[in-house]
């Protein structure tokens, strides 16, 4: 069995949630919440996680409007993805993240408000990554095949 390592990112204006998957590529879990400083520091922090986890790909949540169109925040995230692509050597994919933060909040409902604030972004990143992993599994596309495509997909 091949080991799989993919990172999921929930990119917000103040924080970036980071998630990773288990070696089988079946289960995503939160890793860290990066408090945003500036673009260089943000990219360095993500690059650190890519190196630490030996990530083969990065999945970024793309916040579409409820009608499926891309709004200003989605365009900012695509721009962030383009900046990230310049400093890493792994493919980047995007997945629709509509309501992932709402789902994350519900999942953390029993956690104290202070702890929830610290965890919500990484939980949203885990939801984004889990969705990506599940889509590949449902399409009968092994995660490794998806990684081998090495493209930036902005149409999803």
Curated annotation (Swiss-Prot):
It is an enzyme of class 3 (hydrolase). It is found in: Cytoplasm. It holds the Pfam family RuvX. It comes from the Bacteria. GO terms for cellular component: cytoplasm. Keywords: Cytoplasm, Hydrolase, Nuclease, Ribosome biogenesis. GO terms for molecular function: nuclease activity. GO terms for biological process: rRNA 5'-end processing. The keyword Ligase does not apply. Its EC number is 3.1.-.-. NCBIfam families: RNAse_H_YqgF. HAMAP family: Nuclease_YqgF. Belongs to the YqgF nuclease family. Could be a nuclease involved in processing of the 5'-end of pre-16S rRNA. This is Putative pre-16S rRNA nuclease.
């Amino acid at each position: 069995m091949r080991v799989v390592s993919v990172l999921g990112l929930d990119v917000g204006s103040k924080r970036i949630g980071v998630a990773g998957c288990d070696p089988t590529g079946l289960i995503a879990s939160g890793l860290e919440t990066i408090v945003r400083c500036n673009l260089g520091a943000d990219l360095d922090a993500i690059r650190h996680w890519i190196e630490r986890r030996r990530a083969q790909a990065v999945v970024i949540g793309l916040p579409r409007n409820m009608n499926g169109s891309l709004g200003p925040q989605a365009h900012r995230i695509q721009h962030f993805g383009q900046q990230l692509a310049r400093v890493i050597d792994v493919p980047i994919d995007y997945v629709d993240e509509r309501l992932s933060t709402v789902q994350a909040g519900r999942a953390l409902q029993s956690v104290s408000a202070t702890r929830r604030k610290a965890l919500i972004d990484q939980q949203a990143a885990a939801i984004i990554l889990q969705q990506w992993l599940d889509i590949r599994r449902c399409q009968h596309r092994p995660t490794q095949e998806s990684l081998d495509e090495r493209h930036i997909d902005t149409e999803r």
